[in-house]
Amino acid sequence: VSLIVLFKNFELKSSNLRLHITRSACGWTGVAILFSGVIFIPASDAVAITFLNPVFAMLLAIFVLKERFKINRWIATFISLLGMLVLLRPTLDFESNIFAYLCLAGAFIMGVEIILIKLLSEREPFLQILFINNLIATLIGVVPMIFFFKVPNFFQLIELISIAAAMVLGQFFFLNAMKGTETTFIAPFFYSTLVFVMILDLIFFGVIPDIISLIGASLIIVGGLFINLRINFKLFK
């Protein structure tokens, strides 16, 4: 990202520094809560609760961004949400474990982050958003690195670089999507992450999904198709 910014002679002038800092802080906090939750409650529970963030984002979009309430998008989101629950099969025991509520707070914080990304995408070029937010995230990451850093070997370094490249590429596409449409439209597609994880799990680790996982993945796909087919129907009607 830095090389692209330098190559294009980008002027990094932002009047939205508070938004950038808040967005980066929300991202770090949300991920930290997710990782902490996995330690104390089943991983499927932590991930399932955290994946409520698109629902929070849709609610916030209505009140903060003044986006219209569209029933078809909510139907698509809840179909995908149901697919996620089927796929992960969480126990969701809120009564006996306070860390479940911590993960719920993390999901809300991630929902806030999505709204902040939408606000930034309407005010600044996406490359500038990528550069500034990753710079801030790097500076935040220096603090825990001081205490826990271990020199990676060559293969670990390649893996870390690959992860970073994948994350930046994902952010690139996500920012472009946010810039071009409403938050409530994008929300159902968040759950497709689990479908791709299942496919990659099969390709790289030979893990064959069971029938319940396939049903969950199918529901997630149906949620995404529900919006697209409805849009295409309107275009060709």
Please state what every model-predicted region is.
Residues 1-22, 71, 122-124, 135-162, ...:
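Membrane-interface interhelical linkers
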Residues 4, 93-152:
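Transmembrane alpha-helical segments that form core, pore/gating elements
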Residues 9, 54-75, 148, 195-214:
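C-terminal transmembrane-helix exit sites in multi-pass transporters
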Residues 13-16, 84, 89-109, 146-162, ...:
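Juxtamembrane helix-entry segments on the extracytoplasmic side of multipass membrane proteins
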Residues 16-26, 69-81, 99-104, 123-135, ...:
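Cytoplasmic-side transmembrane-helix entry/capping segments in multi-pass membrane proteins
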Residues 21-39, 104-116, 147-185, 222, ...:
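Hydrophobic alpha-helical transmembrane segments of multi-pass membrane transport proteins
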Residues 47-52, 120-136, 171-202:
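Helix-helix packing/entry segments at the starts of transmembrane helices
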Residues 72-89, 212-231:
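Hydrophobic transmembrane alpha-helices of multi-pass small-molecule transport proteins
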